[in-house]
């Protein structure tokens, strides 16, 4: 559930970023409605990969961030398949935290869908659409986390970076591969919150 993911990511961000003081309590009901509005909006944007066309998601997210006064830039090797990088500054005591979600989805066989895959239909307590759990839920949660940090003027001991990544579904050369090669200083962080991840354990020790 996206709103639950938002709460988890916001709490994780607050914990890792080390708040200088507790933020004021937000209006969670209004936030739930706003989260759903952005969630459905990005689900209705066709970024199925191939061909990708993640630019529609990057532009939507940038528009939301711009209205909140959060600095964001769209960068990429392909104008139709860019990434977005946004940053909220902390006091610099610690290295940044990176929050990521990818904006592309896999393709669809529409004949197998109860509701159209780009409809973001709410039915029976569920939201139906391509990308609902991979990965536009995390993308929306990351976006809302940035909005909350900004609106509540949360004091942070580290910068929080948000990335909307293109090309995760099998074509990472335009996404994280490009970002690491061309924009690493802007995404360099101590920790990353994303859909994936893992550790290597050797002799019972995590390496």
Regions found by a protein language model. Name each.
Residues 126-127, 133-207:
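Acidic/histidine-rich catalytic neighborhood of metal-dependent amide-processing enzymes
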Residues 22-132, 149-158:
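Acidic/His- and Gly-rich active-site-bordering loop/insert found
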Residues 7-17:
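Bacterial N-terminal signal peptides
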Residues 11-13, 113, 155, 186:
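A generic structural signal for short, non-catalytic loop/turn and secondary-structure boundary residues
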Residues 1-3:
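N-terminal secretory signal peptides that target proteins for export/translocation
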Residues 5-6, 22:
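Positively charged, low-complexity intrinsically disordered regions
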Residues 17-18, 39, 44, 139, ...:
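A generic alpha-helix preference that emphasizes hydrophobic side chains
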């Amino acid at each position: 559930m996206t709103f639950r993911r938002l709460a988890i990511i916001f709490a994780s961000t607050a914990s890792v970023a080390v708040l200088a003081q507790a933020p004021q309590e937000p209006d969670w009901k209004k936030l739930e409605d706003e989260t759903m509005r952005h969630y459905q909006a990005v689900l209705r944007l066709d970024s199925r990969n191939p061909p990708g066309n993640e630019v529609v998601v990057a532009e939507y997210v940038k528009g939301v961030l711009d209205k909140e006064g959060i600095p964001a830039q769209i960068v990429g090797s392909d104008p139709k398949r860019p990434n977005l990088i946004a940053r909220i500054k902390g006091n610099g005591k610690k290295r940044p935290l990176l929050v990521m979600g990818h904006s592309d989805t896999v393709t669809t066989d529409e004949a197998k869908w109860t509701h159209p895959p780009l409809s973001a239909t709410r039915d029976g307590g569920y939201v139906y659409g391509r990308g609902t759990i991979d990965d536009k839920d995390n993308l929306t949660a990351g976006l809302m986390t940035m909005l909350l940090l900004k609106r509540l003027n949360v004091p942070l001991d580290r910068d929080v970076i948000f990335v909307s990544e293109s090309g995760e579904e099998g074509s990472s050369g335009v996404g994280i591969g490009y970002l690491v090669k061309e924009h690493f200083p802007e995404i360099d962080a101590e920790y990353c919150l994303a859909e994936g991840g893992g550790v290597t354990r050797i002799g019972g020790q995590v390496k």
